[in-house]
């Protein structure tokens, strides 16, 4: 039996647009167990593609991330290297955004990239995804949306 993804009450509230209908609705679930056919699990890793821990390990174990591949589409996942510094991470996010723009048939579920083992705050990482928010096929964690919309 396939396990269902888990949304918190707050995530479900945002997904309706909130009381005023103005909150972003493209929210990822807190826990991702499964992906639809067109969904891609977006995670942070290192440039060497050593997917030891965190979302990188989940991507490797569950969604086809390739050992030794530090960036790009791999199976049902997309790796963004985050361990090599803010400047290189920002460039990798730009490449991801361009890839998502070129593949509107895919739905990208962006985890809190860079906010785990890489050690960045949401205040540092979320603005890197500002251009991606213009794409209907990119879904972000609620923590990123809160920074981006000032909530």
Regions found by a protein language model. Name each.
Residues 1-151:
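Macrodomain-like recognition of ADP-ribose-binding/processing modules
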């Amino acid at each position: 039996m396939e396990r269902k993804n888990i949304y918190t009450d707050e995530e479900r509230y945002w997904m309706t647009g909130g009381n005023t209908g103005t909150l972003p609705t493209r929210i990822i679930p807190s826990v991702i167990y499964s992906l639809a056919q067109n969904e891609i699990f977006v995670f942070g890793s290192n440039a060497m593609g050593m997917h030891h821990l965190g979302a990188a390990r989940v991507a490797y174990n569950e969604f086809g991330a390739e050992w030794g591949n530090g960036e790009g589409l791999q199976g049902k996942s997309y790796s963004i290297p985050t361990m090599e510094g803010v400047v290189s991470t920002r460039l990798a996010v730009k490449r991801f955004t361009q890839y998502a723009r070129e593949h509107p048939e895919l739905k990208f579920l962006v985890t809190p990239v860079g906010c785990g083992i890489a050690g960045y705050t949401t205040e540092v990482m979320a603005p890197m995804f500002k251009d991606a928010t213009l794409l209907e096929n990119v879904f972000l964690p609620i923590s990123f949306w809160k920074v981006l919309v000032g909530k």
